A protein has these predicted regions:
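Metal-ion/cofactor- or nucleotide/acyl-coenzyme-handling active-site neighborhoods
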Residues: 1-172
């Protein structure tokens, strides 16, 4: 397993599109995917089914762990990696939020995604399928929400910690 620092600057001046777990994930289409794509938890299943040509990352920060089919797997050492007994997948990169990004380990995946975008060298982050932020809808696609009321604060948490411009877009 490699460490996340090996991906430093790999996507310099590109846009990172982060795909959340909101109900609108069911309406996601290939044309919504711009630049480098990073999915959160099980959103990888929907995105990989679209067969994008974009560079694709699967962020697995917590216990809602899903193996991708082809995407580069990004595993949080304290949560996701601790939940599984070894990793039988390549390519995989591990990270520790406190060590690598100097922020609290228990911040939500949307915050960590922006920090990964900064590490990659991206110029901005666009969030899709984060319906709690765009519409106030805390329903999720495919599996039940973990902390639905917390989702409503994700936008503010990202804004508070962001180092590059971020944008939240609706899927129509």
């Amino acid at each position: 397993m490699k460490t996340i620092s090996e991906l430093s600057g790999i996507h310099n001046d590109e846009v990172l599109t982060v795909i959340g777990r909101g109900k609108s994930l069911g309406r996601l289409r290939l044309e919504h995917l711009d630049g480098v794509v990073m999915t959160i938890n099980h959103a990888i299943k929907v995105v990989e089914s679209l067969q994008p040509d974009n560079p694709l990352y699967s962020l697995q920060k917590d216990h809602l762990f899903f193996y991708p089919q082809k995407a580069t797997l990004l595993l949080h050492e304290r949560e996701a990696l601790a939940e599984i007994d070894g990793v039988d997948y390549e390519p995989v990169y591990s990270f520790d939020v406190e060590r690598d990004f100097k922020i609290r380990w228990n911040l939500p995946s949307v915050v960590i995604a922006e920090k990964l975008g900064v590490l990659f060298g991206c110029k901005r982050v666009v969030y899709l399928c984060c319906d709690a932020v765009t519409d106030g809808n805390t329903d999720t696609f495919g599996i039940p929400p973990t902390n639905p009321r917390d989702y409503l604060f994700h936008g503010e948490l990202v804004r508070k910690h962001a180092s590059i411009p971020v944008e939240w877009k609706r899927i129509t």
